[in-house]
Structure formats: C-alpha cells, structure tokens
Amino acid sequence: MKTLVLKISGKFVSPYDTPLVEGYAKTLEALRRKYKLAVVVGGGSVARKYIELAPPSKGLKDLIGIEVSRLNALLLSMHTPSAKKVIPKSASEVLELWDGEDILIVGGLQPGQSTNAVALVVAELVGADLVVNATTVDAVYDKPPSQPGAKRIEKIKARELQRLLESFDWKNEPGRYELMDSIALQIAERSKIPIAVIYGGEPERIPSIVEEEAWGTLILP
C-alpha cells in the first residue's frame, strides 16, 4: 500500500463552510481505503485575518498562523472518523503518532515554514510516495494564472519551478505563502518526492483524480 500526503489549502477547511469540511472528511475516508494517509491543512483566510491584527513581528505572525492551521486540522479530524484526534506540534510528534493505520492530520509546525513545507517534511518522515497539493488553482502556470494568456504546465522540475516562482515576484510572508515555497521545493528535491497540484474546491473528485493520476501539474524532484 502506497503512502500519500494530502496538503489541503486552509481556504477549504474553515468554520465558514461546513459542507466542504464534511466533503473532505468523506474524501479522506475514501483515500484511506487505498493508501496510508497523512494530511496537512493550511490556515486560510481565518489565519490571514488574525495575522493582520498581530504585532509586526513576522515570527509572532507565523505563530498565530500555525495555531489557526492546527485548529483547522482539529476541526477536520473531528469530522473524520478514522483520523487521530491529536494534532502533532512537532516533527517528533508526527513520528510518534504516525502508524500508517489511522489518518494523521497536521497543521503548522514552526515559524518561517509554510504548511506546504510542512507537507514535504511530513512526507519525508512517513516515507510518502507522493504529495498531492489541493490548492485554490488547478495547476501551475507559466505566469500568474490571473494574467491573460497564462498556460498550464503539465510537468516541471522542482528547481525550474523555484526559478519560475521567483520571476513572479511572490514574497514568502506569514499567511501569504503562494502555491509552493522554496523550502518545500528543496525538500522535494532532496528526498525525491513528486508533488501533484490539483484544484481542491471539489473534494469529492479527489479520489478519482488520484486513482487516474489526472494531475493539473506534476512537480518532479
């Protein structure tokens, strides 16, 4: 049985959309029947609101974002019967809690690290074969997808993607980590972990997308 890490944008797991949270819970149960499964949840718009109200220290803003992401992870775990109800707060706790049987759901771990990076750290720790990034866009594009003429990239190397994202002039700010940050890509490269990017707004489609490998973009290590 292969091991899968599913990264879910915090936008899709929030107290403002119970049906979407419940939809993800059903998706996790479906995936668990075929894969050993760990899940990493972002902070989303709730985290960004708290971060806006936080003191100017980026470290403190990160801490607030981490706490919100853990709360989102706990919310999802409560809706998912096969999930552990304890949210790890460190890499060592991930190792202690991981058994390959129950679904392990994780939020943020430490300041300066996006939940995309956390997903790759978790993937390293549990020996995952693949990270699936269920995000707010359906794929990686050759320029910001909001711009006219943006073209979908079917496959791209992690190092090439890092250069591409740098050309977009996106900044890694607390609560504003875009698509995939450099730490996540470096971990993917060093541990040879592929990342599949898909649209996460329709969780009921994710099991078939994974089964058919119908990725928006496949990021190769």
Curated annotation (Swiss-Prot):
Inhibited by UTP. The keyword Kinase applies. ATP binds at residues 7-11, 44, 48, 135, 141. Its main location: cytoplasm. Pathway: Pyrimidine metabolism; CTP biosynthesis via de novo pathway; UDP from UMP (UMPK route): step 1/1. GO terms for molecular function: ATP binding; UMP kinase activity. NCBIfam families: pyrH_arch. This is Uridylate kinase. It comes from Ignicoccus hospitalis (strain KIN4/I / DSM 18386 / JCM 14125).
